[in-house]
Amino acid sequence: MFIDRKTELELLEQRYRSNQAELFVLYGRRRVGKTELLHAFCADKPHVFFIATLSSDSEQLATFSQQVYGFTHADVPSGFTFPSWEAALRVLGELPGQPKPIIVLDEFTYLISGNKAIPSILQKVWDEKLKNTQIMMVLCGSYIGMMETEVLGYQAPLYGRRTASTLLRPMDLASSALFFPGYSAEEKFITWAVVGGMPYYLRTFQDSQNVFSNIRQHILDAQSGTLFNEPRLLLMEELREPRNYFSILRAIAQGRTRLNEIAQGAGIGDVTTVARYLDILQQMRLITRRV
């Protein structure tokens, strides 16, 4: 069941109702609910929902090609693929314009990781063709730093093309409380304080159990706790050197807040290297610097 996100849904609906091509950028931390939001938005509209993976660029192109071809054809030939990303994106300009078709490119940063030219190719096709259609394209990504640099940044090929964007943030207390109608106000607050406003984490708790039973079962249980290994899995999925990031986060959790203290606590002698790691963690919205 999809809960809340009324403001974000209305923003998407407003752009969908426009009389022009839309290039919407949605980004935010992993587990914050971006994909579920887009599924809810697309549910009653014609759409292609492509979720990129860490597979090869040719495999990604083949999967995308088959989804696009299947949008207007009942049967997709086995092994069908467009000859290039440019060819595949240009075909989007031929899709029926009424009702407005939605093309979602989820995990867009995975596409960029596999093919650095993707933003430039999309920029070219957008300028030459797609901007004059009735299409709505949504670029969605979890690696906030890369989305800001490669999609939204001044130096990015797609700079100036987006028609709207939003950073999807964790839910506030009022929205998070909607997950637990059976909890008291105190239990709702404790749950939100422990897991934050991340829908994926909130869904692991059940209000048929008291909040402390949920914490023991889902967070503290090393054998079967759904969230016990979540920090490790997230960092391993997103970063090349997770061991150093673990050490830095552990140092911060132990109360070290100055750069040299963090470097010493993490066992990393070079403060310049630590500063770079901290910057990446800030881009991922996993830590915040307060002066």
Model-flagged regions — what are they?
Residues 1-291:
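Phosphate-binding site recognition
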